[in-house]
């Protein structure tokens, strides 16, 4: 698949719920569970949802990677990156970051 086509269709799968060709945007916050702690892959949108899964698959496809990662907020992404750092590592950023990001860095 060429890059221009991949940017539109990369990582897409037919939505199993209703066989839609384009990924729907799931705006629900919670998902029904079969029993406590037993779900069909999703329980709460902030941690994981079908829309984010589709976005992560698209990112992975564009980068020819096995996995892609998306976060529910910019601060969550910054926190994940900071947790990968080791003592002595340096961070290069702009001085125009969200206030709490500056405190954490």
Predicted regions and their residues:
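N-terminal "arm"/small-domain region of PLP-dependent enzymes with the aminotransferase-like
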Residues: 1-49, 55-57
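Fold-independent oxyanion-binding glycine-rich loops
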Residues: 11, 29-30, 73-74, 94-96
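Structural motif
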Residues: 24-25, 67-69, 89-90
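Short active-site-adjacent helix-start/loop capping segments
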Residues: 34-36, 78-81, 100-101
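Hydrophobic alpha-helical segments typical of transmembrane helices
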Residues: 54-55, 77
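Short loop-beta-helix segment that forms the pyridoxal 5′-phosphate
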Residues: 60-80, 94
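Conserved PLP-anchoring active-site segment centered on the Schiff-base-forming lysine
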Residues: 84-101
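Conserved small/polar residues in nucleotide/adenosyl-binding loops
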Residues: 103-105
């Amino acid at each position: 698949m060429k890059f221009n086509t991949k940017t539109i269709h990369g990582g897409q799968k037919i939505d199993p719920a209703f066989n839609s060709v384009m990924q729907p945007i799931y705006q629900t916050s919670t998902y029904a569970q079969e029993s406590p702690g037993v779900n069909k892959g999703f329980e709460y949108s902030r941690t994981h949802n079908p829309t984010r899964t589709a976005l992560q698959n698209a990112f992975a496809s564009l980068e020819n990677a096995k996995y892609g990662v998306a976060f529910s907020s910019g601060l969550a992404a910054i926190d994940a990156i900071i947790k990968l750092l080791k003592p002595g590592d340096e961070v290069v950023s702009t001085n125009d970051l969200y206030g709490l990001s500056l405190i954490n860095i």
